[in-house]
C-alpha cells in the first residue's frame, strides 16, 4: 500500500527547479515544461512513496496525500490546481537566480535578453482564463497519466 507515501507539502517543498529546466521551460512553454518537471520528480520516487495517484485517468480521479491522510480531490481538481500554482510560484522565484547566473541578460536586443524574456514569460505561466484552463488541463492530464495506480493500492 501507499501508507509510506510522502505528504504533498513535503514534495512541493523538496521540488527545486534547476536552471537548465527553467531554460527548457522557456523553450517549450509553460504547460510542457511544468508537466515534465512535475512528472519527472514524481517518477523519481518509488510508486508507493508518491504523494499523488490517479485511480481513473479518463475521469481524472486524483488522490492526494497530505497531513498523513489520502483524500480524493474534488471534481474541479481544485487541490491539484493549487499545487500547480504553488509550483509556478517556485518557478518565478528561480528566474532571479537565472538572471544572476547570466549577466548581460538584461541588455536590450541581445540573445540572452530574448532568452530571459521567454523564460520570464513561461515561468509565470498563463494569465488569460482560457490559457489557464488549457495549460492546467494539459498538466493535469499528464500528471494523471503518469500517476495511474491500481485501485487496490488506494
List each language-model region with its residue ranges.
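Extended amphipathic coiled-coil helices
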Residues: 1-154
